[in-house]
Curated annotation (Swiss-Prot):
Stretches assigned to coiled coil: none
Organism: Bacillus subtilis (strain 168)
Protein name: Uncharacterized protein YqgE
Region (Disordered): 407-430
Gene: yqgE
InterPro entries assigned: MFS (IPR011701), MFS_trans_sf (IPR036259), Sugar_transport-like (IPR052528)
Keywords, alphabetical: Cell membrane, Membrane, Transmembrane, Transmembrane helix
Compositionally biased residues, Basic and acidic residues: 415-430
Length: 430
């Protein structure tokens, strides 16, 4: 334990937090191995950006619907079961892509819907468990360390998958990689049995939580911020990987891009989680947002593998600066909101609805612009307009404030014991 302290710093961790980090790490590796190449796999069959946009639109449309259904279920059954449902649907997605083979591009809506359902179930459960297991003093550590695990997976997964796919003939490499991802998902399910049961009672109060936007300005600001976060993520999540493949025509080059991006991100997340203090959260969010938008201009007018790699380095620095304080800020806003203990699931669901609403609007705008203009004009224009989403996050979070009155810095745990929260300012391309 003393050696662990030297690595993570002066942070008190419990078994539940460590198990949740392990599950998140397994998920990240499974996704990093396979998901990086799905858009390229479909691109090689279709060759149309509009088709990729429709596929991703199906994903982000099903996610909020599934979040709503998962939220209602989580009021009746253990959240860990919801987590397992998500992993099962993710496994079904990779199996469906594998079984569809060369006809996958003709089933874009169905395949995307399955993945959207998997994401919805998994992330609802993971986010709720994160809120319940972490505390204000450990949230920055958890978010930062989760970023380190994701970055580690991002380094290992794409380069390994790219090497295997490029070395094996036909679709054999995809079969191997998808099978390995399924094994990691299965292990994540096994690890979930070590999590303490955390039942939630009561009725689903989504309408009341939505109504809180009228009386709780912090909640209104943070949900608006999530809409604009989704505005960028909607199209960037699938365009960049395809750009790399188009420039290089190599899955191994795409894996190299992922390796470089994640290697930088690994260190950036580590230092962000250790160095960004609560009073500096908003400045960090602004700096991260500006870096992410500024990096876009590296590839907007001239695109090559070298400029894409440079872009990858800059966003690997920008995302930790933005997300580590931003995600912690979000969870602290929820933790101090009315009925936070009873309605934590509803708060998570509504947050995701705003995030995915931004993604849906992003992809719809992209489809409209590309349909009206040629791709060589429409795509750069879409990137320039929709990429502004991350800098705009700061506009909404800059005025978030917390009162410091007696009794307001306490929230109640499920077991009825008080969890003291500090009077702070107050918790992410997929």
């Amino acid at each position: 334990m003393s050696k662990l302290k030297k690595v993570i710093g002066d942070v008190d961790v419990n078994k539940g937090l460590l198990f949740l980090l392990t599950i998140g790490g397994l998920y990240s590796l499974g996704i990093a191995l396979s998901n990086t190449f799905v858009n390229v796999y479909l691109w090689k069959q279709s060759g149309k950006f509009i088709d990729l946009a429709i596929y991703n639109l199906s994903i982000v449309t099903m996610q909020p619907i599934t979040f709503y259904l998962a939220g209602r279920l989580a009021k009746k059954i253990d959240r860990v079961f919801i987590l397992r449902f998500g992993v099962i649907f993710l496994a079904a997605f990779y199996l469906s892509v594998l079984l569809a083979g060369e006809t996958a591009a003709s089933r874009l809506v169905l395949i995307g819907a399955v993945l959207g359902v998997g994401y919805g179930f998994y992330w609802l459960a993971f986010n709720v468990l994160t809120f319940e297991i972490t505390e204000p003093d450990t949230r920055d550590f958890f978010n930062g360390f989760m970023g380190i695990l994701s970055s580690s997976a991002g380094m290992i997964g794409p380069i390994v998958a790219g090497f295997v796919i490029s070395r094996l003939e036909n679709n054999t490499g995809y079969t191997v990689i998808f099978s390995l991802s399924l094994s990691l998902f299965a292990l994540a399910v096994v690890m979930s049995f070590f999590l303490k049961r955390r039942e939630s009672k009561g009725r689903f109060m989504l309408s009341k939580v939505f109504g809180e936007r009228h009386s709780n300005m912090n909640w209104r600001r943070i949900t608006n911020a999530h809409f604009f976060q989704g505005l960028r993520e909607g199209i960037f999540v699938f365009l960049i990987s395809v750009f790399v493949f188009i420039e290089t025509n190599s899955e191994l080059a795409l894996g190299t891009f992922g390796l470089v991006n994640s290697a930088v991100s690994f260190f950036a997340y580590y230092f962000a989680s250790r160095l960004i203090k609560k009073k500096a959260r908003k400045k960090s969010i602004l700096l991260g947002g500006l870096i992410l938008y500024g990096a876009l201009f590296l590839i907007l007018f001239h695109m090559s593998f070298s400029t894409l790699l440079t872009y990858g380095v800059f966003i690997a620095i920008g995302y930790p600066l933005l997300l580590v304080p931003y995600v912690s800020l979000t969870y602290d806003v929820i933790g101090r909101a009315r009925h936070a203990r009873k309605a934590r699931i509803e708060y998570i669901v509504l947050r995701e609805m705003f995030l995915n609403a931004g993604r849906i609007v992003s992809i719809l705008c992209f489809l409209l612009i590309v349909a009206l203009l040629k791709e060589d004009v429409g795509i750069p224009l879409s990137l320039a307009i929709l990429g502004i989403g991350h800098p705009l996050i700061y506009y909404f979070v800059k005025d978030i404030r917390f009162k410091e009155k007696e009794g307001e810095n306490e929230t109640m745990e499920e077991d009825g014991q008080k969890r003291v929260t500090e009077p702070t300012l107050l918790k992410g391309e997929r």
